[in-house]
């Protein structure tokens, strides 16, 4: 049993970033379970550059089905099947996304086999996570680990979720994944969690919270709460904005944080 929960940003980049890997976090819980939050197309390379082998990964949690969050799943599935002898890891998926993840995204490259058509559970141990359209829904994974999912608005008619990570009964971190600016969700996250990792686009307008919106929000909250916010999912021009985020900080790709 480890003393602390650890989080490392595998990638911090926006969907179109060429300097940074797709936004993704590697979390090690105190029981040693290694969880990857989202697996975009460049994330397997990001894990490799961290020196973290796929053999050490225990599970992947998916927050929504955009390619910069699921595009690397096919590589992981095929690597586990053909290189690691059919090893299965957990695939933790919000319940409404289980069917579309396979039917609309993954089956085009993964359903083919010499003997029969394959399904998602031929590659992963699929674990469905509870969701709620009116608030939070918690799923206990084992005696140590639980996840709370929060419905977010990212793109119209697309299901997307933020996730709260709980280790040994303690709320550890709120991870927005992708969402437009949501003052009420931020209020809740800052009240309930010691750390908040929030997506941040560096221009106003679009399908993510903008830096201007987040700065406007933080002007009205205590500095202690501002210090809890790490910004992620940013563009390649992030250097232009260093020192212009108030008390908030840009999450650094590859840096380990003790939660």
From Swiss-Prot:
Positions annotated to bind Zn(2+) 1: 68-69, 178, 233
Alphabetized GO MF terms: 3'-tRNA processing endoribonuclease activity; metal ion binding
Chemical reaction(s) catalysed: 3',5'-cyclic CMP + H2O = CMP + H(+); 3',5'-cyclic UMP + H2O = UMP + H(+)
InterPro entries per record: Anti-Pycsar_Apyc1, Metallo-B-lactamas, RibonucZ/Hydroxyglut_hydro
Cofactor: binding details: Coordinates 2 Zn(2+) ions. One protomer coordinates the metal ions and the opposing protomer provides the catalytic residues required for cCMP hydrolysis.
Binding site for Zn(2+) 2: 64, 66, 154
Needed co-factor(s): Zn(2+)
Example GO BP: symbiont-mediated suppression of host innate immune response
Keywords, comma-separated and alphabetical: Host-virus interaction, Hydrolase, Inhibition of host innate immune response by virus, Metal-binding, Viral immunoevasion, Zinc
Gene3D superfamilies documented for this protein: Ribonuclease Z/Hydroxyacylglutathione hydrolase-like
Region (Beta-lactamase-like), start-end ranges: 21-233
Family according to the record: Belongs to the anti-Pycsar protein Apyc1 family.
Subunit and partners: Homodimer.
Family annotation (PANTHER family): ZINC PHOSPHODIESTERASE ELAC PROTEIN 1
Role summary: Counteracts the host Pycsar antiviral defense system. Phosphodiesterase that enables metal-dependent hydrolysis of host cyclic nucleotide Pycsar defense signals such as cCMP and cUMP.
Name this protein carries in UniProt: Anti-Pycsar protein Apyc1
């Amino acid at each position: 049993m480890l003393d602390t929960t650890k989080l490392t940003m595998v990638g911090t980049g926006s969907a179109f970033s060429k300097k940074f890997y797709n936004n993704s976090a590697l979390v090690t819980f105190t029981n040693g379970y290694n969880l990857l939050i989202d697996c975009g197309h460049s994330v397997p390379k990001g894990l490799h550059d961290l020196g973290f082998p796929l053999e050490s990964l225990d599970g992947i949690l998916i927050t929504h089905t955009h390619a910069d969050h699921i595009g690397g799943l096919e590589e992981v599935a095929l690597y586990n099947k053909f290189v690691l002898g059919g090893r299965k890891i957990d695939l933790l998926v919000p319940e409404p996304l289980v069917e579309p993840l396979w039917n609309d995204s993954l089956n085009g490259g993964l359903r083919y086999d010499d003997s029969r058509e394959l399904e998602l559970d031929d590659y992963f141990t699929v674990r469905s996570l509870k969701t709620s359209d009116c608030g939070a829904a918690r799923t206990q994974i084992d005696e140590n680990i639980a996840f709370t999912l929060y419905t977010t608005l990212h793109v119209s008619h697309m299901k997307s979720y933020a996730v709260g990570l709980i280790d040994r009964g303690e709320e550890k971190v709120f991870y927005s994944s992708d969402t437009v600016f949501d003052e009420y969700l931020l209020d809740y996250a800052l009240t309930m969690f010691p750390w908040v990792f929030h997506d941040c686009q560096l221009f106003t307008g679009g399908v993510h919270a903008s830096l201007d919106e987040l700065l406007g929000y933080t002007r009205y909250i205590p500095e202690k709460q501002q210090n809890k916010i790490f910004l992620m999912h940013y563009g390649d021009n992030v250097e232009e904005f260093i020192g212009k985020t108030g008390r908030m900080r840009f999450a650094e790709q590859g840096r380990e944080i003790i939660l």
